[in-house]
Amino acid sequence: MVKANGHSLTSKKGKGKVVLFFPTYEREFDNWMPFPYLYLAPFIEKAGFEVCIIDSRVEPTWEEMLKKELKDSFALGITSMSGPDLTTAMRASQIARDMDNDICLMWGGHHASALPDEVFNEDYADFVFLGPAEFTFPVVLEAVYLKKEIPSDIKGVLYKRNGKVLGSRQVNAAIFDYPEPPAYHLIDVEKYRSKNNVVAYFKTRGCPFKCTFCATGNFNVSHKLREQYRKEIRYLVEDLKFRALCFRDPTFFLKASTVMDVAELLHSIGNVRWKGQARGTFHRQYTPEQFKFMRKSGLTSVMFGVESGSQRVLDFMDKKVKRQDYLKSAKVLNDLGIEMYASFMFAIPGETIDDLKETISLMHQLKKINPNIFLQNCIFLPLPSTKMFRDAVALGYKPPTTLQGWSKRSISSKFEDRNDITWMEKSVLTEYIKIYNDEFGEYKHAAEKEKTGEYVSPMHG
């Protein structure tokens, strides 16, 4: 296993060094590895550069580490979402600016991809990468390192020159079928090992659906090659000794042949628990024999983004699923003895009190069919570049216009922590929250319930 002993890990290559910085979120650390960099780093190394990953979530002294590593680096890469993680992202950029104005700052991730001009306006970035950057980041690094012009035909890369933002705003396609394995050698894996020894894994990038609240569907879909995902899964289980896998693909169960191949692999390894995300149509995508084999192979939980119990709202979200589908999937999983983990969204733009009551009704129905179901509540968070973000704006939502503003918005699942729900009329919101609180009381997120023992994930074994 990779050990860092409190020090950052750096690959040794012949050219200059690049630091990749991962910011801190508001919610409690959930043991996710810094996946964007695990995918990007091999391509940077392949181009001959040294790579150092600093993850502020697991490094209490990340500022000192960053200053040390930047002393002999020529570029700093930063990824971020549209929320509290921007605070440490901005701080990292400022540290680099204060140390040496020649350090090239390169931003990527959902927020920079959605609102690149805001990032440039505050002088936190020299380059912004739109969408996946495995094939563009090394090209730009090479040009910066050699002090050459950026190739004019490169897509999905923006930069500022004489006060103007130049480059291509064409978002790069999602590509995941390359042979390069994730750069686990650049992190201390033990810092991401949870009590239940579970590791997250992505077999697919992108999503074929276009749910109006989600930013993932803005890109196309690409799958890891069979040989590659089998090799990587074996490495995680047999070499790194993880005993539970959480497949985080948005629609992991969509392709039955691939899922059964994964189930057969895990069954052959033995003593591995696993879970994945599914659509409501899960109940009709597999035969009874396939369902039973998945259970035998270690499937312990299936996650659903149900979102709403109102068919009107589901259609508005373009979910392409029927309310009844979730009830049927709940029955299938209950009969198999597999946990159903269902997530719901509240305070959706355009949602009515009647819609809320239909959602609560569906939750009761699901609980009756599957008594061991875990119900997760989330409050709608407008994500830039999504249709539902634009819907919220049309209904009165005034989004932040600066990185500082975005960094201060809460991603909490508690109404008392949210003061930005301006897309609902005050009188409606007041009644909405009363009905919600009467039903759920003092709501706790899954992480909070695990901490107090109110919820024990089947992934614990």
What residue spans do the PLM features occupy?
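Radical SAM enzyme core and accessory elements
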Residues: M1-F21, F29, E45-K46, E50, ...
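N-terminal [4Fe-4S]-dependent radical SAM core
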Residues: V2-G14, V18-V19, Y25-E26, I154, ...
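A short helix->loop->beta-strand "cap" motif at the edges of active sites that frequently abuts
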Residues: G16, D98-C104, A125, V272, ...
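Flexible glycine/acidic-rich beta-alpha junction loops that bind and position SAM and/or redox cofactors
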Residues: R27-E28, P116, F209, A256-S257, ...
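Glycine-rich beta-alpha loop elements in corrinoid/cobalamin-binding modules
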Residues: L40-Q170, L381, S385
